Amino acid sequence: MNIIEQLEQEEIARLGKTVPDFAPGDTVVVQVKVKEGNRERLQAYEGVVIAKRNRGLNSAFTVRKISAGEGVERTFQTYSPLVASVEVKRRGDVRRAKLYYLRERSGKSARIKEKLPARKASVAAE
C-alpha cells in the first residue's frame, strides 16, 4: 500500500462513517443535508443504485429515481459530509455492475427482480 492509499485509509477511519453494504440494483434511501437560508434539514432521496465507484476516499454511487414522470439521477460521494446516512430498502438481483440500460427503459421493463435471502439446507432437505 503506498502512502496516498494509507493517508486515505486513515482519513476514512477518522471520519468514522458507517456505510452499509449495497450493490447496483439495490433500492436505497439517502439522507442528504440541505441548507436553505440559515437552517439545515435532511432530505430523503430514494431510488435504485445504478452505479458504484469504489475508490477509497473518492468512492461514489449513482442513484436513479422517477420524479413526476421524469427520470432523475444523482451521484453521491460516499464519504461526503452532505450524506447523513444511507439505508438499504430492498436488495435487487442484477447481473451487471452498471445499470445504465435502465435509462432507456420505463414502466414494467425497468423493474428489477428482488434478491431473496438464501434458504437454509435443512429447509430444502425436508
From Swiss-Prot:
One of its GO terms (cellular component) is cytosolic large ribosomal subunit. The keyword Ribosomal protein applies. One of its GO terms (biological process) is translation. InterPro entries: Ribosomal_bL19 (IPR001857), Ribosomal_bL19_CS (IPR018257), Ribosomal_bL19_sf (IPR038657), Translation_prot_SH3-like_sf (IPR008991). GO terms for molecular function: structural constituent of ribosome. It comes from the Bacteria. This protein is located at the 30S-50S ribosomal subunit interface and may play a role in the structure and function of the aminoacyl-tRNA binding site. PANTHER family: LARGE RIBOSOMAL SUBUNIT PROTEIN BL19M, RIBOSOMAL PROTEIN L19. This is Large ribosomal subunit protein bL19. It comes from Thiobacillus denitrificans (strain ATCC 25259 / T1).
